Structure formats: structure tokens, C-alpha cells
Amino acid sequence: PKIDEFAQQFNSPKYAREKGFVVGSGPYEFIEWATGQYVILNKKKNWWGDKTGGALYAHPPKITYKIVNDWTTAVTALKGEDLDVAQGIRPNDFLDLKKNEQFKQLFNIYTPDELSYIYLGLNRRNPRLADVRVRKALAHLVDKKEIIETLLYGMGSPVIGPINPIKPYYDKNIPEIPFDIEKAKALLKEAGWEDTDGNGIADKMVNGEKMEMKLDFKYNSGNDTRKNIGILLKENAKRAGVEVNVVAREWTVFLEDTKKRDYDIFCGGWIQSPILDDPKQIWHTSSDHPDGDNRVGFGNAESDKLIDELRATLDETKRNELYKKFQEIVANDQPYIFLYAPQNRLAIHARF
């Protein structure tokens, strides 16, 4: 009862938003949160980390996080020095800023690699996508090179699975799925999807009814990169007899759709851990519920057993073998189309 009471209090809005109740051991204290406008933090007096010097030294004395709802406004604010720091700047805006000599005198620009990846989630519950050959076909319709070169302007690298290449248990033997329209067509045909009526869209009889290969691609509105990924997929898919409808959803609606599994394809991203990866949150069947993160319906008894064993294994050599087996299972099932790991696009005022 006491622990339940503590949990309810700890997770309540009061402990997330009210001054005096938001506490921690970091260098700043919470001052104010105006929803949709800003969050203010002040540097603590007599903070323990100041005595250590070096990387733990905290500055400046005050931080204001401004909520800016579109990048056009944010870039204007940067140029006007109304913002001191911005990260995740849109690639095209970032290139323009790099070419702006006046801006470069005021700001330092960085492109550090991110420990994250962008992917397309495929709804395995959808009868159109239940066959792994169809999911493999869709993967062959994604041109990662074009995405990275034309949408990210080279500021990213392709990924082939859920484990970052910097990890010692990354399986470099898993093959990249090449962009190949003809291979996609062949896989669709093998799975029984062909254009039988000449309308340009592959179809198949499913449970006695004719079903066409029409898929919705959902992304969070305002994210131009994800929108354009959908447009590129739409153009490529059409050549293979797959009709893709690109659909924007406001962020909260987008999340709710993925929770309810109300999607065919969605574009998402995961931030990865610098420590040992724990696949359970995303890939275990116990996470396959509305509040869980296994939103593509991946997994079975074999993969669950492997994940459970992996989490309990202390021997590094054995654990690395299990990680590689896990990556192989994911690759064979194709629940995601893994796209790229982005570089962050960061501007920091030169006075810092």
C-alpha cells in the first residue's frame, strides 16, 4: 500500500510540473513551466558538482527552454539571436545556415553522430502485411541512399537492424536489403499478389474477397523528412503495383494510432542506449499491448525465450552470441524497415 501510494504521487502531475516538487541531483532547479511556451531552470546554489570542476561544471546561471512549433520560426529566432541553442534543425535549413557567413560568425555548428535510428514500422496484423515476403518486398522498395543523399544531404548513415554498429555485438554479417523494384515485384507475386484487372495495383483473394495492395503511410505532421520519406516510398511502390497513401497525423493522434495499431506503415524513431541494449521493451511479446512499445506485433515463444535468456546472461561471449541471434531473427522477420542513423544538426551561440 505504501509503495503504491508513493508510486501514485511520484507519477502525478504535481511531481512533474510544480515548483518545489520537481527534484533531482542535477545542477539546475525547476522554476516555471508555461505549457506550449517555455520551461525555466535556474542554477542551484552550492551544487555539489561545481566543486569537481571539469565537465561537471554547470553554466549558464539560467536556462529557458522555448517551445517553438515550426522550424521557420525557430530559424528566424536563431538568426535574430533570440535562441542560443537549437538541435535537430531541418537538413535544408541547416545547410542554408552553414552557408550564411554572418550566422557562422555568431554560432558554432556541429554534426555529431546520434545514437538513434529511424525506421518504418509494418503492421504484421494487417492481412496485407502478414506474409514476410510482402514485408521483404516493401523493404526492397525503399531507396536508403536516395533518402540520405536527397533528404538528409548526406548527414546520416544506413542501418540494417536494431543494434548500433558501435556495439561489440553488432552483427555485420546481416546483409543490407538493396533497393530493387524487380525483386519486390517477384516477392509480391510469390506471395500471391498480382495485378489481375490491369488497374496498376496488385490484388489477391483473401478469405473469399478481393483485396488490393493499398497501404497508408502515417507520419507525425510537421516532420518534413518523414513526409518526404513517405512520398519517395509512394513513388517507388507504384512501380511495383503497391499504392501508398501518405497520411499526416498530429503528434498525439499519431501516437494514439500506433498504440491502437491503426496503421499499415508508420515512420518512427528510437533513441538507443550507450550501455547494453535491452530488447524487451520493443521486441518482447509481453510489450505487445496498447501501452507497450512492440507496436508491430513482433515475436513468438522462440524470440521471447532468447530475449529473456539474453537479459539474464552475464558471460559476455555468450551474451554477444545471443545478441547476434536476436538480430538474425529480427532480420528474417522484417517487422521494421530500418532506414538510417541521423547526424544531429546543432547550432550553439559562440559566446558559450
Positions of predicted regions on the chain:
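Gly/Pro-rich hinge or "lid" segments in bacterial periplasmic/extracellular proteins
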Residues: P1-Y57, K62, T72-T73, I181-G192
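Ligand-site clamp/hinge motif
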Residues: P13-G20, W47-D96, K234-E235, E243-N245, ...
